[in-house]
Amino acid sequence: MSDFYQDFNKRRTFAIISHPDAGKTTVTEKLLLFGGAIQLAGTVKGRKADRHATSDWMEMEKERGISITTSVMQFIHNQHVINLLDTPGHEDFSEDTYRTLTAVDSALMVIDVAKGVEERTVKLMEVCRLRDTPIMTFINKLDREGREPIDLLDEVESVLGIQCAPITWPVGMGKRFKGIYHRYQDIIYLYQQGSNAKKVEAMQIKGLDNPQLDELIGDSADELREEIELVKGASHGFNLEDYLAGKMTPVYFGSAINNFGIKELLDDFVEYAPGPQPRATQERVVSPNEETFSGFVFKIQANMDPKHRDRIAFLRVCSGAYKKGMKLSHLRIGKEVQISNALTFMAGDRSHTELALAGDIIGLHNHGTIRIGDTFTQGEQLKFTGIPNFAPELFRLVRLRDPLKSKALLKGLIELSEEGATQVFRPLNSNQLILGAVGILQFDVVAHRLKHEYKVDCIYESVNVTCARWVYSEDDKAMSEFRTKAYDYLALDGGDMLMYLAPTKVNLTMAEERYPKIKFCATREH
């Protein structure tokens, strides 16, 4: 095994964030292509094409061409182990994305050159801000006409409140796109429309004043020289400390679909991006160089392999090393478990791993005992913090077409809710099942997966619930009285936590006023 593979400092764990359709999944594919993880990149738009993007592997994603769940992929580049977490671009899956951002050390933001900063990017950036996550930026689709690069940098700075340091700079765009200039290497990489699926080495010209540049790109050479002078005066120089503190984003330009500008980004990413960072627990801060193992579960995915009807818990290793066959304490349930078959991932492909270090993501087989937010250690009582659970904003009543399938329905809903993509509520006063979600597409996903993976066909009806809140109280007497008086509005969620289901916002406000000793919470930590 290579030396670098056994060094946690050589780990780079990051997520890609963007607005839908900025080209995030294509960028993911091309990073894997240049990282040597795949030989041929699939393309995302060819919905019916034979070759699908490696990271979009769930049936429904293949049909719709959108990334719904977070994929985890590991590959090696320049003697570093890179763990790439692809997040759903679709806004209905924000919870999955928020939780994924708790498991990474840095992020890559993808922006469409024609559209600039979009709403979803703003929201994701806010989440990164909470943790001061270092962010690199890739401005994509330079092979099409778009906005002026300098205007885009201004927009990123003003809307997202982060300084931009352009590392590469485009030579033209659209039909006039000739390549990119790397400001710190003083090299021009000439654009050639790469075969979409294979990597091609770009032709390089050393030096902005090289006469060869004028021969090859004509008038564009002088335009580039003028622009670079302007950029020097109008933009920030790259400062590594500011980037690592989340105050500055290095910016790269390119065309992911044509494999252009990605390699330069990847080379710099490996050099600049942070390795595994310390993590907060309720008890203390855990450092990645500690010898004993610790980690937390940030995602659960059911049926990654329909042939095996299994569930996998994705665990971020925070310290120490996982070694095959080791015993770990599953702290929430107070049990020691032996783990001999942890997995690593290349999107839908998985293989058993012998070793995982801080920064790595491993998959644990889950037979219903592991939940999002669970901590695993070698015995020390720790609870990692900051893994959010959001109260849903949309609700549906679920009815079975075949009443004999009620057992399968409950099993399916509980398993799907354990993934955190949807929530299931059982009202105390009836046998009904109510589904809650943050976005409308989640209901489609649940319906599709219940039908195909659990063979349960349901009818989904509107229900008289507008908002839900977790309810707690430190005063047992007040809680007991509240349970009696508000009985008709109470339900249990998939984890048996008590929730208040309010038919209207006014009803919720009145309940909060009437029961001052009860806390009504829109989020809770896992």
Swiss-Prot record:
Record InterPro entries: EF-G-like_DII, EFG_III/V, G_TR_CS, P-loop_NTPase, PrfC, RF3_C, RF3_dom_3_sf, RF3_GTP-bd
Binding locations of GTP: 18-25, 86-90, 140-143
Keywords: Cytoplasm, GTP-binding, Nucleotide-binding, Protein biosynthesis
Reported function: Increases the formation of ribosomal termination complexes and stimulates activities of RF-1 and RF-2. It binds guanine nucleotides and has strong preference for UGA stop codons. It may interact directly with the ribosome. The stimulation of RF-1 and RF-2 is significantly reduced by GTP and GDP, but not by GMP.
Subcellular location per the Swiss-Prot or TrEMBL entry: Cytoplasm
NCBIfam families for this protein: prfC, PRK00741.1, small_GTP
GO molecular function list: GTP binding; GTPase activity; guanosine tetraphosphate binding; translation release factor activity, codon nonspecific; translation release factor activity, codon specific
One cellular component term from this protein's GO annotations in UniProt: cytosol
Membership in a protein family: Belongs to the TRAFAC class translation factor GTPase superfamily. Classic translation factor GTPase family. PrfC subfamily.
UniProt-listed Gene3D superfamilies: P-loop containing nucleotide triphosphate hydrolases (3.40.50.300), Peptide chain release factor 3, domain III (3.30.70.3280)
Source organism: Legionella pneumophila (strain Corby)
Protein name (record): Peptide chain release factor 3
Superkingdom, taxonomy of origin: Bacteria
Residues of the tr-type G domain: 9-277
GO BP: regulation of translational termination
UniProt keyword annotation of Ribonucleoprotein present: no
